[in-house]
Regions:
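Bacterial N-terminal signal peptides
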Residues: 5-17
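Early extracytoplasmic/domain-onset interaction patches
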Residues: 22-62, 132
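N-terminal, post-signal-peptide region of Sec/Tat-exported proteins
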Residues: 47-84
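Non-catalytic architectural context of zinc metalloproteases
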Residues: 69-78, 82-242, 255
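Post-HExxH zinc-binding segment in Zn-dependent metallohydrolases
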Residues: 265-274, 299-300, 311-362, 555, ...
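C-terminal recognition in membrane/secretory proteostasis and scaffolding
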Residues: 330, 340-603
Length: 603
């Protein structure tokens, strides 16, 4: 291949061998970042063994695992193509598709720059501190050649010495990595810079923690806890389905989130969480969540989620399974790992239950509907979303709890959701090309339970209230409902929240509450309560002074005009939920408890 010097544009090389039927590299990419302060990666994309006079190149519009059309092509300001020194015509035919007029050339090179300056797990980022690449937001692909193998060569910015990725290295080629097809390339992030590397092995398989940033992290403790999570998950599935695994951990200011990949995961965390037990537990829950996705999503998956269509939304009713039941397992794995005890585990589960029970949207939208609508609702929330939506994460986690308890009770503690995922994993291994349908998932669950589970499916399919205690009673537990801190049954309640350091401005109004029926709006500034001037600091106390059943007259500023809103104080709803053991469990309850959590009752 002839080299083409082009100072402005970064290089991705796609190199396709002309020899048919061999195992040589078909597609390769070279990527560099000579000016990271500009936040532009430079790519050179070389296509060999070309047979078409017109070649379509595409840029994905979304990232698998993050269900929103993000239009990554908008970050590419210009694309050029060359065959040797001959410039080829490039036409844009729709928002994410280019046509290269290749003529009779067997090989041509595409050059482009792409802007990357969003710190999230689902996009790419480049600055003078590091480079993070998420494949779908970086790499163009040849429309009809997604399933050809290739290589990626990375040229780091000067002084950057480390490249972490889940892709295997190519022997004899510096900073070069191979992939079997575009799907794997798109699902294999890169972290480039001078980050720390922590390593451990489970079942003889190497695991790497690529740790970026400074914070109050105890690296030895981090590595030990990650290893425990991997070990406890491996006990479910027995074998690890990869030759190597990478945890990308980005310690940043005030940021969070995680995204699963085929043999890696990216997790952002606030750099100062690691000395706070509660925040660190939540971080480890995220780690367990993303790692469990190695099976549940990346392999065991709804039929719509792979192979992917990168051009448009990929709809499924089953994200409550893929994300929600994974959310159930993330806390359970911390218990099995010995990272938390039963009491702390119950608090973590209580947090999921609280998320559901305090959301008015649970009465409007089912978990199945939430799954399907994620493309237009979950990532596009507004001030009304909590009133009309339920998260398939939290409602799915709660449904997973009820499903696990139902299987446990139906089999006298002998079986659980573990056996469901073991069977689904066996099916995947027999046919990796196809995901499950909703019916197939439910059939596997019912076969494991030995009965129909319509009493559980209604929690996914409808907005029926969850009867927690009917299931928890069988394992000697009860769901305890509480008021929040400083709240009693006689505390007046209105159903709105505010923001603002000095003057309270309404940020949320809950459906069916005094504030909602009284006509209070988001963005109303509250000036006075019953004739008394209030500030953010004094508002709550003035409202508490009003007895349940009495009226509160609020003087508000709405769009710069003063007006009055009247509402009647009501009693408070429960807003804290936690599972507790009963004091005198029966022998059968103890047996089912131990079958559920795998830990002795008395421990």
């Amino acid at each position: 291949m002839k080299s083409i010097k082009w100072i402005i544009f970064f290089s991705i090389i796609i190199n396709v061998e002309t020899v048919m039927g061999n195992n040589d590299t078909k597609i390769s990419y070279h990527i560099s970042m000579p000016e990271p302060h500009t936040h532009y990666y430079e790519l050179e994309m070389t296509v060999s063994n070309n047979r078409d006079r017109t070649v379509q190149l595409k840029m994905p519009v979304w990232t698998p695992g993050s269900y929103l059309v993000r239009e990554f092509a908008r970050h590419i300001p210009r694309v050029r193509a060359f065959a040797g020194t001959q410039q080829l015509k490039v036409d844009k035919i729709d928002k994410n598709t280019l046509e290269v007029r290749a003529g009779y050339y067997k090989e041509f090179t595409v050059m482009y720059r792409i802007y990357a300056y969003e710190q999230s797990v689902r996009t790419s980022y480049l600055s003078d501190s590091r480079g993070y690449l998420n494949g779908t937001s970086i790499f163009l692909y040849v429309a009809d050649r997604k399933y050809e193998p290739g290589e990626v060569k990375v040229t780091p910015f000067r002084g950057w010495r480390k490249i972490s990725t889940g892709l295997p290295k190519v022997k004899g080629k510096r900073n070069t990595f191979s992939f079997p097809d575009y799907d794997v390339l798109a699902d294999s992030p890169f972290l480039i810079g001078n980050h720390d590397l922590l390593t451990f092995k489970v079942k003889g398989i190497p695991h790497e923690i690529a740790l970026y940033g400074q914070g109050n992290v105890d690296k030895d403790q981090l590595k030990d806890d990650f290893k425990k999570i991997v070990q406890s998950t491996a006990e479910i599935f027995e074998d690890l389905p990869y030759d190597r695994y990478v945890f990308f951990i980005l310690m940043l200011d005030g940021l969070g989130g995680g995204l699963e990949h085929l043999n890696s995961t990216t997790i952002q965390a606030d750099r100062w969480i690691f000395s706070d037990d509660n925040r660190y537990q939540r971080f480890l829950s995220t780690v367990a969540h993303e790692y469990f996705h190695t099976w549940n999503v990346k392999r065991i998956r709804p039929i719509a989620l792979g192979p992917f269509d990168y051009d448009k939304e990929n709809y499924t009713d089953d994200l409550w399974i893929s994300e929600g039941i994974t959310s159930y397992y993330d806390n359970l794995l911390l218990l099995r790992s010995g990272i938390v005890d039963v009491e702390d585990y119950f608090k973590l589960v209580g947090r999921d239950i609280t998320s559901v029970e305090t959301a008015p949207g649970r009465l409007i939208q089912s978990a199945v509907e939430s799954s399907f609508d994620t493309w237009i609702k979950n990532y596009r929330r507004n001030e009304e979303s909590h009133n009309v939506m339920i998260s398939y994460y939290s409602k799915g986690a709660v449904t997973g709890l009820m499903l696990d308890l139902a299987i446990n009770a139906s089999t006298n503690g002998r079986k659980s959701l573990d056996q469901v995922f073991q069977e689904l994993n066996r099916r995947y291994e027999n046919d990796p090309s196809t995901g499950f349908t909703s019916k197939e998932f439910r059939t596997v669950c019912e076969n494991v339970a030995g009965r129909k589970l319509d009493d559980v499916w209604r929690y996914a399919d409808t907005t029926d209230e969850v009867d927690y205690n009917s299931a928890l009673e069988k394992v000697g537990c009860i769901l305890e409902r509480k008021y929040g801190e400083g709240v009693t049954s006689s505390t007046s309640y209105y159903g709105f929240a505010t923001r603002g350091e000095k003057n309270p401005v309404v940020s949320r109004v809950y459906a069916g509450t005094p504030a909602y029926t009284g006509g209070l709006n988001v963005n109303d500034e509250i000036v006075a309560v019953n004739g008394t001037r209030v500030s953010t600091k004094t508002l709550i106390e003035r409202l508490k002074d009003i007895s349940i059943g009495d009226k509160a007259e609020l003087l508000i500023s709405r769009e710069g005009l003063m007006q009055r809103v009247e509402m009647t104080a009501s009693g408070p709803p429960y807003d804290s939920f936690v599972i507790k053991k009963t004091e005198s469990p029966s022998k059968d309850q103890k047996q089912l408890f131990e079958g559920w959590l795998g830990t002795p009752w008395e421990k």
